[in-house]
Swiss-Prot record:
Glycans are attached at residues 111, 410, 810, 944. The keyword Transmembrane applies. The chain crosses the membrane at residues 1039-1058. This is Pro-epidermal growth factor. It is found in: Membrane. It is a single-pass type I membrane protein. It comes from Mus musculus. GO terms for biological process: angiogenesis; branching morphogenesis of an epithelial tube; cell population proliferation; cerebellar granule cell precursor proliferation; epidermal growth factor receptor signaling pathway; epithelial cell proliferation; ERBB2-EGFR signaling pathway; ERK1 and ERK2 cascade. Disulfide bonds join 366-377, 373-386, 388-401, 407-418, 414-427, 429-442, 445-457, 453-467, 469-482, 751-762, 758-771, 773-786, 842-853, 847-862, 864-875, 881-895, 888-904, 906-917, 923-936, 930-945, 947-958, 982-996, 990-1007, 1009-1018. Residues 1-28 form the signal peptide. EGF stimulates the growth of various epidermal and epithelial tissues in vivo and in vitro and of some fibroblasts in cell culture. Magnesiotropic hormone that stimulates magnesium reabsorption in the renal distal convoluted tubule via engagement of EGFR and activation of the magnesium channel TRPM6. Interacts with EGFR and promotes EGFR dimerization. Interacts with RHBDF1; may retain EGF in the endoplasmic reticulum and regulates its degradation through the endoplasmic reticulum-associated degradation (ERAD). Interacts with RHBDF2.
């Protein structure tokens, strides 16, 4: 072949292979992904239409239905008798069962209506099956050994097979035209054609109790007793009896029923009183649905879904109504339906076939007597509606108009309004709504129930409407509820000592993060980078990690205390938190570098927090002295009080971003409330049904609440509070509920982070990244990379593409190895159905909040959770720190006990992850206070400073060293981020001035951070260097402050003493105390002139004497003279004043001076401590000087006439003031 033609052939081969793979991919998608497991919501993919599956099961004498997620639980038949077996016909929406007590075959519609008898049956019926293609019912008569078949009405019954040995447990596959049954006596499995021919024995085994088919995998499953009487195992084989396999399951004891659908197995266990769901290949991913009443074991179990009963006939024989509606466009306004008898098109109701029989045209119903309307009729395409003039109202029958006369006092308690008619009060509804079944409440687009629509209600005509959904949501089969398209949502939550997630139906229940968690009560999810942000309450920091638990990174380690709430702004790219220890609301960018306080005034104990990025507002709860719910802008301004009345401890808070509705829970009142974002239209949603609520989350039609009273997660309808379902499973304290789904946080753009993973072009579409390629390229198989158009498609890695898209149901069922023993593989979610009291196999009340009930179907016991030990009948926390069971290094950390675990807090000089502690290299990080030019040497838990080979004191500089310069040859500063040791691709790798270096021994790159920063990329601000650097200055400053304080204190003491002395002196002068020498008699014995002074001194304190001084009189020339011992006496006395005229009185009396006399004498008064002071302050004497007894002789020598005598005064005189 010429080389020029080869590109043409290559292109043709490329197109053929591409077409083949595309067809294979589509087929695999339709046969694989469109084979939804019972918990796979196929409508989310947008490609597989169909209703969600539900379960039908017998329980005692009743038959009920329930969704796999535990919702919509209701009884279809109250009294079904003793049912031997049952089956359904999905297309005809019928349920058939045998009442062996009444010996009849009965049927009812799947909604529980239309109960009727089909035919009589034998008493020993042991199995029932329905051929949904030929519309026939088959049952097994074990006593007579026959298999009987009849039509759906029971009129044409006939024996299909006879002479069988105790047949039981029949199952059919109408597509393959085969039926299967078992024999109890021989323990064998048999097969035959549905016509009753080609009977074949497949296997001979023992103890077959349950038999069922997986029509999608074309395999036969049965339960076989082990022979030991306590265990039963699930076996399977193909339709030929080959490829027998044993299926491993966690609970496989005494199975009473089982059913398969997709990759799931549904089964019930005797004495377990529950329905179990698990992966049919591995037995893992288990969910338990506890039923109500819980004391009756479920019997027969079936999955109701169109793919559980697939059909093969063509559209002409059995047309698909949905397909015909899509093909009915040539009928113009009407939707055409195919008449199976005439094979001609018939118009839908409200339309008629045109005369040329080519299209459908509208019928004008109002043209014929207003079609029953009393006062007015309006025609609409395909229908009509009655109208009323002003002043009249349309009655609930939709045809009669009545004059608007209001009822007095609304006696009928109508939800909207009441009109008085001749027949009495009648409730009326606004335009667009109709009266409900109770005759009082209204439903419709103008009513509070929004017409039953979960999102959008579209009025069609008065009394008629239809539901629609927001972009990204799909309308479900009930034509009312909406479900998010895309991946199945995950519920992410903190569990005190770990972080977990599960699907809404309890599947995929796993632990994401468990190591070194301490205590976690606050977390949130970033849909842009797909990361989890969470707060470590015990270790007092904020971390983030990937959704798979990898790449944990500490963001904020300083400035936070008791973190209880966390919220992420996925549009503004910031995080916010509540800190009850510091009584603040804080915020930061996602790197944790720039964090600040948002709210710190008028706030007590903030707990829950939520952010509305589009409204640019924060909402938080406060559980302090004045409980309240508040709102503010993202900067902390414009604070608004949302609610403050009827609150005790408002804890969790969340926002419904589709309806702008605020939800919060009150822990102490056990109440869930809702309101608008401004606090208006506040109403109570749930009360006393949620135990101890802590946090909330809302998505689709559901509101999720975490309960600490019974550690679990509760789901209710977000508008009504009904359909309560409780999910639990080895939980401790579930909190911070977060829904992970692209639509859970509207407006998120994953293309902002690493281009959404796309190589070329990224387009955001409903929260997901859509990758496109530039011209000349095509997308690779991963949907993200782009390849040239001429890239060889038949490469080795793409040759096995068919294996990658093969349906899971077609994979082999080899024996699955045992569990790996990890905690994530043993988690079992348990669904508690609404309306039932909490009870499990371990008895009423369960095992408490710190234990779980473990049942094997026969027996049950309580097992304490990890970190707890049995203490009597309860499980108590193990204090690993006190019992020395922790792994905390004693030399570098301190153990802190937490509920169910512990954490290690590193000592100064170390850092760690909550378990291990590592030495900090202060020298490399620059977190030291060695003086300028001094050398720093790292040590374990610290560092040393040296200066030219000798130790240097911290903070001092070395004089002979020169600091390395950061200047280049041109005199400019070097760029630290372009260090020669790193390639250009690392430009910008080191942050905050860090220098990138290449370590040859490790062949890796690292950052040398400047002083004040630390971390792998110098991303963490570290202020410890400042404290260390200024420690010496701080000590000097402290000494100086102490010295100044001491001096000031001494001065204050001196001033105090002087003030005290001055005050006491003044007080003594004004109020003299009593003389202790005064006797009560008042007499003082006097001595004669010859008495010595020693006698007087012996009886009283030393006396005081006064010598008068006369001022010098220049005229008389008198001059003072000194006496002995310094005493001063008058050498010359004035004629007008003689010495004898002065009497020295007692200290209580004023000095007394007589006139001149011949008898000169001196009186020595009793001594007193205040004698001289009293005399000194007396103004009667011109001058004086106090002297002691030693100077008395000197005085007497100068005045020889002086002698002692007692005073004889008529009265006492008060001291001179």
């Amino acid at each position: 072949m010429p080389w020029g033609r080869r590109p043409t052939w290559l292109l043709l081969a490329f197109l053929l292979v591409f077409l083949k793979i595309s067809i294979l991919s589509v087929t695999a998608w339709q046969t694989g992904n469109c084979q939804p497991g019972p918990l796979e919501r196929s409508e989310r993919s947008g490609t597989c239409a169909g209703p969600a599956p539900f379960l039908v099961f017998s329980q005692g004498k009743s038959i009920s239905r329930i969704d796999p997620d535990g919702t919509n639980h209701q009884q279809l038949v109250v009294d079904a008798g003793i049912s031997a077996d049952m089956d359904i016909h999905y297309k005809k929406e019928r349920l058939y069962w045998v009442d062996v007590e009444r010996q009849v075959l009965l049927r009812v519609f799947l909604n529980g209506t239309g109960l009727e008898k089909v035919c009589n049956v034998e008493r020993k019926v042991s199995g029932l099956a329905i051929d949904w293609i030929d519309d026939e019912v088959l049952w097994v008569d074990q006593q007579n050994g026959v298999i009987t078949v009849t039509d759906m009405t029971g009129k044409n019954s006939r024996v299909l097979l006879s002479s069988l040995k105790h047949p039981s447990n029949i199952a059919v596959d109408p597509i393959e035209r085969l039926m299967f049954w078992s024999s109890e006596v021989t323990g064998s499995l048999h097969r035959a054609h549905l016509k009753g021919v080609d009977v074949k024995t497949l296997l001979e085994t023992g103890g077959i109790s349950v038999l069922t088919l997986d029509v999608l995998d074309k395999r036969l499953f049965w339960v076989q007793d082990s022979g030991e009487g306590s265990h039963a195992y699930i076996h399977s084989c193909d339709y030929e009896g080959g490829s027998v396999r044993l299926i491993r399951h966690q609970a496989r004891h005494s199975l009473s029923s089982m059913a398969f659908f997709g990759d799931r197995i549904f089964y019930s266990v005797l004495k377990s009183k529950a329905i179990w769901i698990a992966n049919k290949h591995t037995g893992k991913d288990t969910v338990r649905i506890n039923l109500h009443p819980s004391f009756v074991t479920p019997g027969k179990l079936m999955v109701v879904h169109p793919r559980a009963q697939p059909r093969t006939e063509d559209a002409a024989k059995d047309p698909d109504p949905e397909l015909l509606k899509q093909r009915g466009r040539p009928c113009r306004f009407g939707l055409c339906e195919r008449d199976p008898k005439s094979h001609s098109s018939a118009c839908a109701e409200g339309y008629t076939l045109s005369r040329d029989r080519k299209y459908c045209e509208d019928v004008n119903e109002c043209a014929t007597q207003n079609h029953g309307c009393t006062l007015g009729c309006e025609n609409t395409p395909g229908s009509y509606h009655c109208t009323c003039p002003t002043g009249f109202v349309l009655l609930p029958d939709g045809k009669q108009c009545h004059e608007l006369v209001s009822c007095p006092g609304n006696v009928s308690k109508c939800s909207h309004g009441c009109v008085l008619t001749s027949d009495g009060p009648r409730c009326i509804c606004p335009a667009g709504s109709v009266l409900g079944r109770d005759g009082k409440t209204c439903t419709g687009c103008s009513s509070p129930d929004n017409g039953g629509c979960s999102q959008i209600c579209l009025p069609l005509r008065p009394g008629s409407w239809e539901c629609d959904c927001f972009p990204g949501y799909d309308l479900q089969s009930d034509r009312k509820s909406c479900a998010a398209s895309g991946p199945q949502p995950l519920l992410l939550f903190a569990n005190s000592q770990d972080i977990r997630h599960m699907h809404f139906d309890g599947t995929d229940y796993k632990v994401l993060l468990s190591r070194q968690m301490g205590m976690v009560f606050a977390l949130d999810y970033d849909p842009v980078e797909s990361k989890i942000y969470f707060a470590q309450t015990a270790l007092k920091w904020i971390e983030r990690a990937n959704m798979d638990g990898s790449q944990r990174e500490r963001l904020i380690t300083e400035g936070v205390d008791t973190l209880e709430g966390l919220a992420l702004d996925w549009i503004g790219r910031r995080i916010y938190w509540t800190d009850s220890g510091k009584s603040v609301v804080g915020g930061s960018d996602l790197s944790g570098k720039h964090h600040r306080i948002i709210i710190q005034e008028r706030i007590s104990r903030p707990r829950g927090i939520a952010v509305h990025p589009r409204a640019r507002r924060l909402f938080w709860t406060d559980v302090g002295m004045s409980p309240r719910i508040e709102s503010a802008s993202l900067q902390g301004s414009d604070r608004v009080l949302i609610a403050s009345s009827n609150l005790l401890e408002p804890s969790g808070i969340t926002i419904d971003y589709l309806t702008d509705t605020l939800y919060w829970c009150d822990t102490k009142r056990s109440v869930i409330e809702m309101a608008n974002l401004d606090g208006s239209k506040r109403r109570r949603l749930i009360q006393n049904d949620v135990g101890h609520p802590f946090s909330l989350a809302v998505f689709e039609d559901h509101l999720w609440v975490s309960d600490w009273a019974i550690p679990s997660v509760i789901r209710v309808n977000k508008r009504t509070g009904q359909n309560r379902v409780r999910l639990q499973g080895s939980m401790l304290k579930p909190s911070s509920l977060v829904v992970v789904h692209p639509l859970a946080k509207p407006g998120a753009d994953p293309c902002l982070y690493r281009n959404g993973g796309c190589e070329h072009i990224c387009q955001e579409s409903l929260g997901t990244a859509r990758c496109l390629c530039r011209e000349g390229f095509v997308k690779a198989w991963d949907g993200k990379m782009c390849l040239p158009q001429d890239y060889p498609i038949l490469s080795g890695e793409n040759a096995d593409l068919s294996k990658e898209v093969t349906s899971l149901s077609n994979s082999t069922q080899a024996e699955v190895p045992d569990d790996d023993g990890t905690e994530s593989s043993t988690l079992v979610a348990e669904i508690m159905v609404s309306g039932m009291n909490y009870e499990d196999d371990c008895g009423p009340g369960g095992c408490g909040s710190h234990a779980r009930c473990v049942s094997d179907g026969e027996t049950a016991e309580c097992q304490c959770l990890k970190g707890f030990a049995r203490d009597g009948n309860l499980c108590s926390d193990i204090d690993e720190c006190v019992l020395a069971r922790s792994d905390c290094p004693s030399t570098s950390s301190r153990c802190i006990n937490t509920e169910g675990g512990y954490v290690c807090r590193c000592s100064e000089g170390y850092e760690g992850d909550g378990i291990s502690c590592f030495d900090i290299d202060e020298c490399q990080r620059g977190a030291h206070n060695c003086g300028e030019n001094a050398a720093c040497t790292n040590t374990e838990g610290g560092y040393n400073c040296t200066c030219a080979g000798r130790p240097s004191s911290p903070g001092l500089s070395c004089p002979d060293s020169t600091a390395p310069s950061l200047l280049g040859e041109d005199g400019h500063h070097l760029d630290r981020n372009s260090y020669p040791g790193c390639p250009s691709s690392y430009d910008g790798y080191c942050l905050n001035g860090g220098v990138c270096m290449h370590i040859e021994s490790l062949d890796s790159y690292t950052c040398n951070c400047v002083i004040g920063y630390s971390g792998d990329r110098c991303q963490t601000r570290d202020l410890r260097w400042w404290e260390l650097r200024h420690a010496g200055y701080g000590q000097k400053h402290d000494i100086m402050v102490v010295a100044v304080c001491m001096v000031a204190l001494v001065l204050l003491l001196v001033l105090g003493m002087w003030g005290t002395y001055y005050y006491r002196t003044r007080k003594q002068l004004s109020n003299p105390p009593k003389n202790p020498c005064d006797e009560p008699s008042g007499s003082v014995s006097s001595s004669g002139p010859n008495s010595s002074s020693g006698a007087a001194v012996a009886s009283c304190p030393q006396p005081w004497f006064v010598v008068l001084e006369k001022h010098q009189d220049p005229k008389n020339g008198s001059l003072p003279a000194d006496g002995t011992n310094g005493a001063v006496v008058d050498a010359g006395l004035s004629p007008s004043l003689q010495l004898g005229s002065v009497h020295l009185t007692s200290w209580r009396q004023k000095p007394h001076i007589d006139g001149m006399g011949t008898g000169q004498s001196c009186w020595i008064p009793p001594s007193s401590d205040r004698g001289p002071q009293e005399i000194e302050g007396n103004s009667h004497l011109p001058s004086y000087r106090p002297v002691g007894p030693e100077k008395l002789h000197s005085l007497q020598s100068a005045n020889g006439s002086c002698h002692e005598r007692a005073p004889d005064l008529p009265r006492q005189t008060e001291p001179v003031q």
